[in-house]
């Protein structure tokens, strides 16, 4: 899908403020409401815009202990990766997981209610058939910057 400057500007604005009104969005990109909204619908239909949501401050709702874990698997093949990734998807306390290159295979973020809860989870993973060779645990002491989905038009134009 080819994106022009209007599409890019729409994406930039919606990534910062998904609740902006149709008229304010149209005004911000210098289009009338109808063509602006048609562009938004086209971007949604094409899968460029996957949805809209609220960023929740989970610290206000429930106190959790964030823990980052570096994980290295025993075997490095498609079956081992698939088995591990299935376990990640089935563990609600895992809020983020990325496969990485370098000395480890995955970085996994757990958000458990207590360190004991995290320890029980990792112990279950270790005795399971998922094939963890070794892991390193890093307990978060302070969040310096929260992830954000907002983007700038400069990011999109490249």
From Swiss-Prot:
- Cite a GO CC annotation: cytosol
Q: What domain of life? A: Bacteria
Binding region for DNA: 22-41
Instruction: Print the keywords alphabetically.
Output: Cytoplasm, DNA-binding, Transcription, Transcription regulation
List, alphabetically, the InterPro entries matched. Answer: ArsR-like_HTH, AsnC-type_HTH_dom, Dimeric_a/b-barrel, Tscrpt_reg_AsnC-like, Tscrpt_reg_AsnC/Lrp_C, WH-like_DNA-bd_sf, WH_DNA-bd_sf
One GO term of the biological process aspect: response to amino acid
Pfam families membership: AsnC_trans_reg, HTH_24
Identification of the protein by name: Transcriptional regulatory protein DoeX
The record's function comment reads: Acts as a transcriptional regulator. It binds DNA specifically to a fragment from the doeA promoter region.
Instruction: List the source organism.
Output: Halomonas elongata (strain ATCC 33173 / DSM 2581 / NBRC 15536 / NCIMB 2198 / 1H9)
Q: What SUPFAM superfamilies is this protein classified in? A: Dimeric alpha+beta barrel, Winged helix' DNA-binding domain
Recorded name of the encoding gene: doeX
Q: Which SMART domains does the annotation name? A: HTH_ASNC
């Amino acid at each position: 899908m080819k994106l022009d400057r209007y599409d890019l500007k729409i994406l930039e604005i919606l990534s910062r403020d998904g609740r902006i009104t149709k008229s304010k969005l149209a005004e911000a990109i210098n289009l009338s409401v109808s063509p602006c909204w048609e562009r938004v619908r086209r971007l949604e239909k094409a899968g460029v815009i996957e949805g809209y949501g609220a960023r929740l401050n989970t610290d206000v709702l429930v106190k959790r202990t964030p823990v980052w874990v570096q994980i290295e698997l025993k075997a490095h093949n498609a079956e081992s990766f698939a088995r591990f990734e299935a376990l990640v998807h089935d563990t609600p306390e895992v809020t983020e997981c990325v496969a990485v290159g370098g000395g480890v295979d995955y970085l996994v973020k757990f958000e458990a209610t207590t360190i004991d809860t995290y320890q029980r989870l990792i112990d279950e993973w270790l005795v399971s058939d998922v094939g963890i060779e070794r892991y390193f645990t890093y307990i978060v002491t302070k969040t310096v910057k929260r992830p954000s989905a907002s983007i700038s038009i400069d990011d999109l134009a490249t």
